[in-house]
């Protein structure tokens, strides 16, 4: 089925317009190595009665994610590494010590009677927030779910005049005396907290206790200026590389090379727009994947043009050389790109963090480069060869 060149050109213009709109509308997500922040590796600890299972690690990740969300950190990255490790990456964070305390604390809250028997745990809480008493001292008001409220009302009704011990991770943080039955399902936790301590406790209680204890085995702080300097160096190198590629393509392939440069620019716009649309996090390995896919796109154009020259040497017309050149080069291009995508999929499956970012940008870039070569590059070349000036001026064309 032959599609008219005008329709193909209109399709390219529409796709390019949408891509430019995406680039101008949506922001990039930058990874830790570019934006700076902290990277913490946690190891789940096996204790008596607690097994380290995939489900336990998954639930631990969810609790940590809830805590981080309440810290107000944008675009955190939390993922499992191995069978018992959790990696937490927090870009752009301003108070890493406080974040580390909130991330790694088990936060098992217990309400105990004077004999040490546990009456309630933090799982009975529905909400926790910071309030202030009459003298401005911060405290944490907790609200219980219906089941917890019923149990606590029954306990306080039977133990008026006795103490209730509020214990966090085995440490008593408050031991008030029960003056009257508490039937509303709310209570306050006092303990000479600072405002930061009260806010931290409220966050921990709202997010819930970690299903398994964790231990910090690695903690790295990444300076944002390092990522900025690296990106500036990569940008300069990219500009210089792009200029050299453009000059090389024009010098070797002349007008064919110029068309390839235009198609390459369109490809870069489509690739960056696709990354933004997928909400992908851009890291330095991801940038490397983009650059590598651009290199593969240039290689494919060189292969197509070399085939076109071979066909033209057999006294074919420029348009017939174009058809035969694409047809003969397509198999090699597809084989090369599919092999690269398979390698990227293996990296994505077995890798973590930055390795996955490299795999995503590489596979996406390679897939888009195939689309660009088959549709955009060919359409641009067909439009070029249809011009009367190039029907005889084949030297200028590059054939």
Curated annotation (Swiss-Prot):
The keyword Transport applies. One of its GO terms (molecular function) is protein-transporting ATPase activity. Pfam families: Sec_GG, SecD_1st, SecD_SecF_C, SecDF_P1_head. It is found in: Cell inner membrane. NCBIfam families: 2A0604s01 (TIGR00916), secD (TIGR01129). Part of the Sec protein translocase complex. Interacts with the SecYEG preprotein conducting channel. SecDF uses the proton motive force (PMF) to complete protein translocation after the ATP-dependent function of SecA. Belongs to the SecD/SecF family. SecD subfamily. This is Protein translocase subunit SecD.
């Amino acid at each position: 089925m032959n599609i008219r060149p005008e329709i193909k050109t209109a399709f390219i213009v529409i796709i390019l317009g949408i891509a430019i709109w995406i680039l101008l509308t949506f922001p990039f997500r930058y990874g830790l190595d570019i934006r700076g922040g902290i990277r913490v590796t946690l190891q789940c600890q096996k204790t008596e009665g607690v097994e380290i299972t995939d489900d336990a690690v998954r639930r631990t990740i969810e609790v940590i994610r809830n805590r981080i969300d309440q810290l107000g950190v944008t675009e955190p990255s939390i993922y499992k590494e191995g069978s018992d490790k959790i990696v937490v990456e927090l870009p752009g964070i301003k108070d890493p010590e406080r974040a580390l305390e909130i991330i790694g604390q088990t936060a098992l809250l217990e309400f105990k009677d004077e004999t040490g028997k546990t009456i309630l745990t933090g799982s009975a809480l529905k909400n926790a927030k910071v309030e202030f008493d009459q003298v401005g001292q911060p405290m944490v008001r907790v609200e219980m779910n219906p089941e917890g409220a019923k149990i606590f009302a029954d306990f306080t009704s039977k133990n008026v005049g006795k103490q209730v011990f509020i214990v966090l991770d085995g440490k008593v943080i408050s031991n008030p005396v029960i003056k009257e039955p508490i039937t509303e399902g709310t209570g306050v936790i006092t303990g000479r907290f600072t405002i930061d301590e009260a806010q931290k406790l409220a966050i921990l209680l709202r997010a819930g206790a970690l299903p398994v204890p964790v231990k910090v085995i690695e903690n790295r702080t990444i300076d944002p200026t390092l990522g900025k300097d690296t990106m500036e160096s990569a940008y300069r190198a990219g500009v210089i590389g792009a200029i050299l590629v453009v000059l090389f393509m024009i010098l070797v392939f002349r007008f064919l090379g110029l068309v390839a440069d235009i198609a390459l620019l369109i490809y870069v716009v489509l690739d960056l727009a696709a990354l933004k649309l997928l909400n992908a996090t851009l890291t330095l390995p991801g940038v490397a994947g983009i650059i590598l896919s651009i290199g593969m796109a240039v290689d494919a154009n060189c292969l197509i043009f070399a085939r076109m020259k071979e066909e033209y040497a057999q006294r074919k017309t420029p348009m017939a050389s174009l058809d035969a050149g694409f047809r003969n080069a397509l198999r090699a291009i597809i084989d090369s790109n599919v092999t690269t995508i398979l390698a990227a999929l293996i990296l994505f499956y077995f890798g973590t963090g930055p390795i996955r970012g490299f795999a995503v940008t590489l596979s996406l870039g390679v897939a888009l480069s195939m689309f660009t070569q088959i549709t955009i590059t060919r359409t641009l070349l067909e439009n070029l060869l249809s011009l009367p000036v190039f029907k005889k001026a084949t030297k200028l064309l590059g054939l």
